[in-house]
Design a protein with these regions (language model features):
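The feature encodes the CheY-like receiver
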Residues: 58, 86
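A short, hydrophobic beta-strand element within the central beta-sheet of small alpha/beta folds
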Residues: 75-85
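Acidic, metal-coordinating helix/loop segments flanking the phosphotransfer/catalytic sites
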Residues: 32-50
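C-terminal output helix
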Residues: 88, 106-119
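Active-site residues of response regulator receiver
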Residues: 8, 54, 82
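Acidic catalytic/metal-coordinating carboxylates
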Residues: 35-38, 60-64
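Short amphipathic alpha-helix used as the core "switch/output" element in two-component signaling
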Residues: 41, 63-74
Length: 122
């Protein structure tokens, strides 16, 4: 079972992801956070397999949180989610240690495949 933490400052995005991911037989959502700081605490407590992390958030953005998370909790892989698809954002996410980067408007099948692949390679 792939254990996930969802991190996004929009409750509707977290709710939509949770509803879609929990119907997958090999996935379970174990926690949710609305910013990078909350995510850091949850990841240290729950040690999920995958963290689905939004890029743009208040308090601590997803890229900064990913860099700190990779240093403190390397067993959890981070899959970045963003509405922005520019090369610079992707490069910063990968430099911070993200396992993958998925555009929010992409097909759910791509996100599911990315989660499964990141879980296998973490």
């Amino acid at each position: 079972m792939i254990r996930l933490v969802l991190v996004d400052d929009q409750p509707s995005v977290r709710q939509g992801l949770r509803m879609r991911l929990t119907v997958e037989p090999d996935m379970t959502v174990v926690g949710e956070a609305s910013n990078g700081r909350e995510a850091m605490i949850l990841v240290q407590q729950l040690a999920p397999d995958i963290v689905l992390m939004d890029v743009q958030m208040a308090e601590m953005d997803g890229i900064e949180a990913t860099a700190e998370m990779r240093a403190s909790t390397p067993q959890s892989a981070v899959v970045m989610l963003s509405i922005s698809d520019d090369v610079s954002t992707r490069a910063r996410a990968h430099a911070a240690g993200a396992a993958a980067f998925v555009h929010k408007s992409g097909a759910i099948e791509l996100l599911l495949a990315t989660i499964r692949q990141a879980a296998q390679h973490r």
